[in-house]
Amino acid sequence: MTEAVRITDIATGGDGVGRMADGRAIFIPRTAPGDLVEPTGVRLHSSFAKGGLGLLREASAARVAPRCNHYEADACGGCQIQHLSAPAQREAKRRILEQALMRIGDVQVDVPAVESGPEWGYRNRITLTLGPNGALGFHKVGQPDVLFDARHCEIARPVVNQLLAAVRLARTTIPSGTTRITLRDGRRGHAGIVLWADQPPSGTESDALRAALRDGFPGDVPELWWRGPRGESKALSANQEGIGAVGFEQVQPDFGDRIRSIALDMLESVADRLVWDLYAGRGEGTALLAARGARVESVEREPELFALAQRETLPTVRRFLGSVEEVVGQLSPPDSVVVNPPRTGLGATVTEALGSAGPERIAYVSCDPATLARDIRRLGPQYGVETVRAFDLFPQTAHVESVVLLARR
């Protein structure tokens, strides 16, 4: 008889974790804490194993029926924990963050309950892959080279699903060479489509796609953009006002604004203080800091986002275009710092610069518990963790956001 495994936790990435009889941890997707399962296709490594869900002997009370047909029928890899109840998802994310801080960051802290927003229909954008066989969709879980044709996404906003339906109808007019397509519902009501390809489409190709979209999309014709392999972008229709192809925006912008405000509140009074705003994006946090009386030095590497930020002239703000690693040595000594890095975290160069600069407080907005914990460990000799808050911007997935306040020892 196949060995049965009791699932005890959810790991980073969303796999369930249990222990085999030989003591090895085994990671099994689509399982829940409390499940008793028989794994299949077990692949043994020196200290752990991976497998699939073969037989579910006992179902956890945390299990629910997935809402999306693609989740089970097509093994969609876009969501990892749709089979968990909302409370179980939030607890899993709380533990993922707490365990990362303890094991990687060497920080003993009780992470409070995860704060969450809408569970469904929240994403303002999705990116689909265009397959050689005409499939337009997402990758299967554990099979990054296998696509399935996506008809609907339960975590995407209604406008995004309307765009998906329109693009499916217009798929014969998608310009040749397109490898991916991003569908986005802009904050100011500008629906947009980004075509990812080595070269921009011709005017004839763009016109044909726009004409087909006009017939299939109920609103105004979506803005159309091209995005190249080296970050190049180009507007493919006139008078476009959206954020564009390159500009990053949270999938829940209003929730992102709230997290940003929480991070700035952690700095307490910033009036007449110098604050670094690193990875500043479009400058929303910079503007809030300036409104609170701070002198701000902000750094952003994306030219498009930098240009958007510069539209607002603020006398107490100095803006720097470039990577934080390249620019941080040019900044004045700060009183406080806000960092909001990508999933790769700060990196050694930036943590060293922060340690040398010696700000009183660092508000760290993180989208990856592991790199957050790594950076906290690097800053540990000089900074201690004062506050941790966790947020679920991506229900049904294993992603967890957090804000951590670090204070100089």
Regions found by a protein language model. Name each.
Residues 1-72, 87, 95, 276, ...:
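Terminal RNA-binding accessory module
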